[in-house]
Structure formats: C-alpha cells, structure tokens
Design a protein with these regions (language model features):
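A glycine-centered loop/beta-turn motif at secondary-structure junctions
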Residues: 204-205, 234-235, 257-347
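Accessory, solvent-exposed terminal regions and/or long lumenal/extracellular loops of proteins
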Residues: 327, 406-608
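Intrinsically disordered, low-complexity Pro/Gly/Ser/Thr-rich segments with frequent PxxP/GP/PP motifs
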Residues: 71-106, 513-543
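Internal/C-terminal transmembrane anchor helices
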Residues: 360-383
Length: 608
C-alpha cells in the first residue's frame, strides 16, 4: 500500500515510496523507471498526467533524475518541451507526477531520461495533446469524459450513461470509451490507493466515478484531490449509500427510490460542491439511475465545457479582461527621426563634405548616421510605451472558511514590450490554460514554448510574445487562512477584514438571514455593520451558473452579484481592491491592474 502524504505539503508533487518491486521498468544506470499515463481520450483542456515510478538500486548514493518530453522540431507544434527533475534517495522507491497541458497542437513520442546530468536513454511514449481550440461560442459540445475506478460496474455504468456496448473499448492497458457516445468512459489502470494526490491530475476529466467503499479506503490525499476537483467545476459520482460529503453541501436534487423488487430500487442525490457537483447513487439493486446520470452529464456540458470552449481563444479572453485597450506605439516620433536622418545623411552631409573636400568620408559617415538613427528609432519605440510589462488580474473566489479552502476562477492578461526573461510562474495547484491566437503556432517551425516543473510550474520561452497581448485562464484550489471575522456584542455585529487587502464593498448575510452592507474596510480593521440593508435576496442560484456560465464577476456585471441568487444565510460577497487569491504569473515584475470578488462561506463560530 502507498504511504499517503498531503499533496499540499509537497510542492514537487512526489508521491510516497512504494515498497514493492517495479513491474515493466527499464533500467538507466542505477535507476529503474516505469512510465504510465492516466488515460485521456479527448485532449481538450487541463493536464494529462504521466506517472513515473522510480527505484534507486544504489543503496549508498542518491541520484538526480530528470525526465524530458521533447516534441519534433517542425510541424504544427505549440509546445516543444516538458520536463521535471527529482532526487531519488539511496535505495529508495518513489513516484513522480509529470503533468502535460492539453488542448495544444503538440505530439511527444519519447521521454528522455537524464541521471545526474547525463542522458542515459529514452522511454517510449506517445502523447497527442490535441488540436488548436476554436474558441467559437455555440460550437457542438464534445462528450463528457469519465474516469471510472476499477470497482465500478462497467455494465451498470454503460446502461446508466446510455452508451452502446462499445461504450468501453480496449485501448492498450486502459478501457477507453468510443467517441460519439453520450459520454467517453476511461477505466483507471490502478486501484484508487495508487491514484495521484493532486486535484490537477484529474483536470482533464469531467466526471470521476468511484464506489463508496473506495472512498473510505482511499488515502486522504486522494479524497482531498477528488473533492477539490469537484469544487473546481467537475463531478464526483459515488456509487453507494454510505458516502457522506466531507463538508456540508446544499442538496440540489434528491430522487425517491424507484424500481421493483426484482430489479432492485435505485435512487440518487445531487449535491452542490463548489462550482461542481457530487452525485451519490444508491439503491438495493446493481443498476444506476439513468436520470441522475443525465443530470451530471448536462452539468458537465453546460457549466464546464461550454465555458472553456467559449473563452479559449485570445480574442474572447481580451473581451473579458482587456489588458491593453490601445497600443501606444510612437509612430510620429519614429517618422520624425527618419526624416531628420534623410535630411542629415543626404543633402547636409554631402554639402559639408564637399566644402571640406572630404567626399570619401561619405562611406563611413553614412553608416554611422544610419546606426545612430536605428538606435534612436528603437529607443523611441521602447521608451515611448515603457519597458515595464502590464498585467490585468481578475477573478472570483469561493472561500469556504469551514474547510479553509479557496477555489478560484480567474484570468491573467499580459502585455510585455520585451519577452519576460524568467517566463511565467504558477503554483502546482493552478491549472493554466493558454488562450492562443487561432493561427499562432501554425506553420513549418515548432514553437519553442517549454514547461518546466521545479519548485513551481514555469512557462518559459514564447508563452508571452513581445508586444502582443496574451491571456491565460486559471483554475486553482488551495488551502488559505484568510477569512472574514465576525464579532457579536449583544445585538451589535462587527466584521474584521482578514482577507489581506482592502474590501471596497461587503454584502453580508448573517445566519438568521439579515442582510448588511458595508463599504471601505481597510485590511485588518474592525468595522460595525450598522443596520440591516434593504436588499431582498432572490431565489437561490447554483454557484456554477453564476460564476461559470454567466461569469457575473466580470467588470461590467459584478455590481449585480448580490441579486444573482448567490447569497444565502451564512455567506458574504466581498469586492476586493486587489486580487490576493488569483495567481499572477509575472508576480511583482509588472504594472498590475487587479480586481476580484470573494464569495465567502462562514463558519458558525466565526471569530477574528
């Protein structure tokens, strides 16, 4: 059994040691490596995770191992290299995750293995990361992709989903669904005890299906990862009555038991899990509710696929959060410099040299003047719009203070006069989706984009081109300590701003349903909320509808969030002066415009 370790503590994503012999491994010096991939049939978004299981047969010396996926030098390639390096202790066994971003036109056919800086050989692997995303709103949605655990009945799931008998087809060691079906079903190659403990490892799947017994026996890190995956917009489907959600959730739909004594009774309950769903299927028979399964397929298409396909191109992302409304290229100054050069290098130069009887100097003075003019033009362009990059950071966060967890949907927009020397850096808990120009990366030459997994995920080389606005869609789930403190003194209520930045506007719904509204709360300050506000709460809406589908956190719509149906007793909306929960790939090296909204879920015993 794998020794579990909380994935949030291990920035490298390294799994625990495996006290069993590696099967199907290849040897590279003292290191044995076996490589497997999590099955993905539709490479559209998220990451396809490679799992490298390593063993160091040298009991006296540790070794540094680096795995490098390299694409071809030519062709329609948007990502050239993905790499990661870890250290394998003397006599140790371990597993390493190597996530590869999907939805980019890229292909990898081998994985180079370097041990202590020397290439020892290659592992054979075939990865097709997909075609360029269209970003066309209204295009036909693809079938949701299911990851199915080994204990789930394939026949029962196939009937519930509505696939034909080819709903599962053999593809190598994994059972992969046929395209054109209501859903694509991919069977996990290993038991749930060996599944990755990072939520982003499941980001390519719309639905993960397990049994209640598997939930109980899974390592804590795997349970945590699956629940975070659901909170980021996906679906966790559990077969079995004994499952209980790890946090209190609103019930969206509950079906009574239907069926007969012969076939058995079936029922289902669908909970709201952050931006996603948790569906529990129970009953006394072996069947699974088709009605309940159709509900989660509908959610997957409407709340996740539709959103990502709508905003996957740079033009659509620019309309959501424009980083630059107008390029400030100093063309007038450049033309003036060129006109002065033509005048000085031409008639004035000839006249002066003729008067001094130095006509032969024309052959070195003219090139010098040309070089000086070129430098002046370059300087006018660079300093005319500045050398400092511009960044636009926006997003919305669901801050569940009961669990200390923040789920964020956001966007990064960058405009860089010069390519960032260090590239972009994001945490391991952040899913990064590049919003590419539709024709970018096409042609005969491969793009030099590289992804390096070290202490963070580093996007290097041409992820951000000079003087071209570039956008990245983000999903992240992380542990956070920030919260809004409540202080009660009899009938008086005060709030303490523990969110890290100034709150420009706060709409708070107390546990008894009373609505309060406060403005301008500096970081760390305590402010009395005063009397109840006049806001009447509308009928509740699902968080996924407000935040994902309608994206009411956009600049021109965020003021309407209090009347969107999002607020309920024990929650609040905080309009922040900055964006402390939204990752910034350029970090502090850019001139940044930030804005964000937090939807907070309070704890009953909330105190500062």
């Amino acid at each position: 059994m794998m020794k579990s370790r909380a994935w949030g503590w291990v920035l490298g994503g390294v799994l625990a040691c495996l006290p069993v012999a590696l099967t199907g491994a290849e040897r590279f010096g003292d290191i044995e490596i076996s490589l497997e991939t999590m099955p993905v049939s539709q490479p559209r978004r998220g990451y396809q995770t490679l799992i490298a299981r390593m063993a160091n047969r040298d009991t006296k010396k540790k070794h540094g191992v680096r795995l490098v996926l390299q694409g071809p030098e030519h062709g329609v390639i948007a990502l050239r290299e993905v790499s990661r390096q870890v250290e394998v202790g003397a006599g140790a066994q371990m597993s390493m995750l190597l996530p590869v971003p999907l939805g980019l036109p890229s292909t990898f056919q081998s994985c180079a293995v370097e041990v202590d800086g020397y290439q020892e050989g290659e592992l054979s692997i075939v990865l097709n990361l997909g075609a360029m995303r269209s970003g066309v709103h209204g295009a036909a949605l693809s079938s949701p992709e299911f990851l199915v655990s080994q204990r789930v009945s394939r026949d029962a799931l196939r009937v519930a989903v509505g696939t034909s008998r080819s709903g599962f087809s053999r593809s190598g060691p994994a059972m992969v669904g046929s395209l054109g079906q209501p859903a694509v079903l991919s069977l996990a190659e290993r038991t749930i005890e060996a599944w990755p403990g990072r939520w982003s490892a499941y980001s390519a799947y719309d639905v993960v299906v397990i049994t209640d017994l598997e939930w109980r026996t899974a390592p804590e890190s795997v349970r945590d990862a699956l629940w975070r995956h659901a909170e980021c917009g996906a679906v966790l489907a559990v077969i079995g009555d004994s499952f209980v959600p790890p946090v209190a959730c609103r019930t969206l739909e509950q079906s009574p038991a239907v069926g007969n004594a012969t076939a058995g009774l079936v029922r289902f309950t669908i909970y709201e899990a952050g931006l996603g769903r948790c569906a529990v299927f129970g009953g006394s028979g072996p069947t699974i509710s088709r009605r309940g399964m159709s509900r989660i397929i509908n959610h997957s298409q409407r709340s996740l696929q539709e959103v990502w396909e709508r905003v996957s191109s740079a033009s659509n992302a620019h309309s959501l959060a424009p980083v630059l409304k107008k390029v400030r290229t100093p063309l007038g100054l450049s033309f003036i410099v060129l006109a002065i050069f033509a005048l000085v290098a031409g008639p004035i130069n000839l006249m002066v040299l003729r008067r001094k009887n130095r006509g032969i100097w024309l052959f070195w003075i003219t090139p010098v003047l040309g070089l000086a003019t070129s430098l002046m033009v370059i300087a006018s362009v660079l300093f005319g719009e500045g050398l400092k990059p511009l960044a636009r950071i926006e997003g919305m966060t669901i801050l569940d203070e009961r669990a200390g967890r923040a789920t964020t949907i956001g966007i990064n927009g960058f405009y860089c006069p010069l390519r960032p020397r260090k590239g972009l850096a994001y945490s391991y808990d952040t899913e990064v989706t590049a919003c590419l120009v539709d024709t970018y990366g096409m042609g005969t030459k491969a793009s030099p984009r590289e992804l390096v997994w070290d202490e963070q995920q580093h996007l290097r080389k041409e992820w951000v081109a000079p003087r071209v606005p570039q956008y990245f869609r983000l999903r992240t789930s992380e542990l956070r300590k920030e919260r809004l403190g409540l202080l009660r003194d009899g009938s008086q209520l005060a709030v303490v701003n523990g969110l890290g930045v100034t709150i420009e506007r706060l709409v708070l719904v107390d546990f008894d349903g009373t609505v309060y509204e406060v403005t301008d709360i500096p970081e760390g300050d305590q402010v009395s909320v005063g009397g109840p506000a006049a806001l009447v709460l509308p009928r509740l809406s699902a968080m996924s509808d407000v935040i994902l589908r309608r994206e009411q956190w956009k600049t021109d719509e965020r003021d309407n969030l209090p009347s969107s149906g999002l607020l309920r007793p024990g929650t609040y909306l905080a309009y922040l002066e900055g964006a402390p929960f939204v990752p910034n790939g350029l970090q502090r090296s850019a001139k940044t415009t930030e804005a964000s909204v937090v939807f907070g879920i309070l704890r009953e015993e909330a105190q500062p």
